[in-house]
């Protein structure tokens, strides 16, 4: 697992400051909504200064992984489980945006307006949120993460590579039937977004939209040998979780009293 050992030499705070300046002057680009991530997304990029590679040979940093996949593939669930198991923070772009849906936030009006009008959150806003989150985490001593919600396009993936040292991208795949059933039966309604976002028509539209860009993102990471495809069947079942751990060459020692791993 040599891909767990790479690290950048430049301070992440320095890189994030540069990225924030460049995007502050850029035209506002937009991101789409995915019900699996609860809200709207954005973009981000690279951290650094690690903890410890899982193979024991890397510098002192945690893993920096991305979870991607079709809407309804339980990315949020698996990202949360992996973050606890690997003892790195789970960063969800959907959650970061949701936190700013507070009248006291300087970004509230811009985000609320986009949500209420079913428009996309500007890219400049998303990058600002992610940059802030990474800076705050680094200041607290965080050196790794499990990220989901981005990248959605090749451009976002390239941008992410300028901010964070992505070690691995887990691509969660599932059948068409599972996607529809999962969205129709398992997702709670979000009041401010309205039930129309969870209708079969909306679900299919999101899936088609995501699929167009997903292929280019998959190819981007596949060429870097960072992509791991994993088929989600029963989604949250114990067998699926154990299958994911096996695919990642991880083993959870004790599910009830320990978060230790073996390779």
UniProtKB/Swiss-Prot annotation:
Pfam families (alphabetical): ADK (PF00406)
Alphabetically ordered keywords of this record: ATP-binding, Kinase, Mitochondrion, Nucleotide-binding, Transferase, Transit peptide
InterPro entries reported for this sequence: Adenylat/UMP-CMP_kin, P-loop_NTPase
Binding site for AMP: 98, 119-121, 149-152, 156, 206
Compartments reported by the entry: Mitochondrion
Enzymatic reactions: AMP + ATP = 2 ADP
EC number: 2.7.4.3
UniProt: ATP binding residues: 72-77, 234
Quaternary context: Monomer.
PANTHER family per record: NUCLEOTIDE KINASE (PTHR23359)
Family per record: Belongs to the adenylate kinase family.
Function in brief: Catalyzes the reversible transfer of the terminal phosphate group between ATP and AMP. Plays an important role in cellular energy homeostasis and in adenine nucleotide metabolism.
Protein's recorded name: Probable adenylate kinase 7, mitochondrial
Originating species: Arabidopsis thaliana
């Amino acid at each position: 697992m040599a891909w767990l050992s790479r690290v950048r030499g430049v301070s992440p705070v320095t890189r994030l400051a540069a990225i924030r300046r460049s995007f502050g002057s850029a035209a506002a680009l937009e991101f789409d909504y995915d019900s699996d991530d609860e809200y709207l997304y954005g973009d981000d990029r690279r951290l650094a200064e690690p903890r410890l590679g899982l193979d024991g040979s890397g510098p002192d940093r945690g893993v920096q992984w991305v979870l991607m996949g079709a809407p309804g593939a339980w990315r949020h669930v698996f990202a949360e489980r992996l973050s606890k198991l690997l003892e790195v923070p789970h960063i969800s772009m959907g959650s970061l945006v949701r936190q700013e849906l507070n009248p006291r936030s300087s970004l509230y009006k811009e985000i609320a307006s986009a949500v209420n009008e079913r428009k996309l959150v500007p890219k400049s806003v998303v990058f600002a949120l992610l940059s802030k989150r990474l800076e705050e985490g680094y200041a607290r001593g965080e050196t790794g993460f499990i990220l989901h919600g981005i990248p959605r396009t090749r451009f976002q993936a390239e941008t992410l590579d300028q901010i964070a040292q992505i070690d691995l991208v887990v691509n969660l795949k599932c059948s068409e039937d599972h996607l529809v059933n999962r969205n129709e039966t398992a997702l709670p309604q979000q009041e401010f977004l309205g039930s129309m976002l969870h209708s079969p028509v909306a679900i299919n539209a999101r899936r088609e939209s995501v699929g167009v860009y997903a292929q280019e993102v998959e190819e981007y990471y596949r060429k870097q040998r960072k992509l791991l495809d994993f088929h989600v069947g029963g989604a949250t079942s114990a067998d699926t979780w154990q299958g994911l751990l096996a695919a990642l060459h991880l083993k959870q020692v004790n599910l009830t009293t320990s978060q230790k791993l073996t390779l």
